[in-house]
Every structure is written in C-alpha cells, then in structure tokens.
Amino acid sequence: MAKLSQDDLLAQFEEMTLIELSEFVKAFEEKFDVTAAAAVAVAGPAAPGAPVEAAAEQDEFDVILTGAGDKKIQVIKVVRELTSLGLKEAKDLVDGAPKPVLEKVAKDAAEKAAESLKGAGASVEVK
C-alpha cells in the first residue's frame, strides 16, 4: 500500500460526511486503543496559607448612557461622534436610555467617552 501524505489524508477527510468521520474516529480509537477526547488538566488543592490571587483586571468596558439630562441635543451630537451613528439612530439611543453607547472598549477609550458624554450633560456609567 502506498504511503499517503498528510495533505492526501486531509483531502480524503474533506470529502467525508460527518457520520463517516464519526465512524472513522470510532474505528481509529478501537484499532489503536486511544481516545480522541482532550486531556483535562486537574489542578491540585492550593497550598495552605497561599494568598488568593486577585481577580484578573478587566480590560474591556461598556459605556452606558443612563440619562440624557437637560442638553439632549448636545448628548446626541456626542453620541454621533463616538459611534458614527446617523442622527435618527443616535436620537433613538439617547431617548431609549439606559442603553450602551460603546461596548467592549479599552479602559482609556471608555473613560474618554464617559467624560465627553458627561461634558454634554448626560449621566453615564462605565462597567
């Protein structure tokens, strides 16, 4: 039997259906007495007296508009600058507060956005 290259094998697998691949994996496991399941790492108990690690610092933040305040037009302008939304979309976002303005942004970007919105008269929350 001719030896197949890795590329040849992959080409053959691409032509198989999921059922055929599943049957192949089962046959392979039985033939070579192995399992296709990923090994699970088990952590041992923590050493006594070991300090508990601090929670990982959050690196993604959401800027949530909680209220438009008295200067709604200014807030809409700032929302448009921050999000590149159209006038109607920005107005709907401001009218529907509380709503997220920016999601999963860096801390400094979230702080700058919050400052801009607060400067326009909005009430803002950074989570």
From Swiss-Prot:
GO CC terms of this entry: cytosolic large ribosomal subunit
CDD domains referenced in this protein's UniProt entry, alphabetically: Ribosomal_L7_L12
InterPro entries for the chain: Ribosomal_bL12, Ribosomal_bL12_C, Ribosomal_bL12_C/ClpS-like, Ribosomal_bL12_oligo, Ribosomal_bL12_oligo_N_sf
Gene3D superfamilies membership: 3.30.1390.10, Single helix bin
UniProt KW rRNA-binding keyword: no
Keyword RNA-binding (UniProt): no
Function: Forms part of the ribosomal stalk which helps the ribosome interact with GTP-bound translation factors. Is thus essential for accurate translation.
Family: Belongs to the bacterial ribosomal protein bL12 family.
Self-association and partners: Homodimer. Part of the ribosomal stalk of the 50S ribosomal subunit. Forms a multimeric L10(L12)X complex, where L10 forms an elongated spine to which 2 to 4 L12 dimers bind in a sequential fashion. Binds GTP-bound translation factors.
Identification of the protein by name: Large ribosomal subunit protein bL12
Organism: Streptomyces coelicolor (strain ATCC BAA-471 / A3(2) / M145)
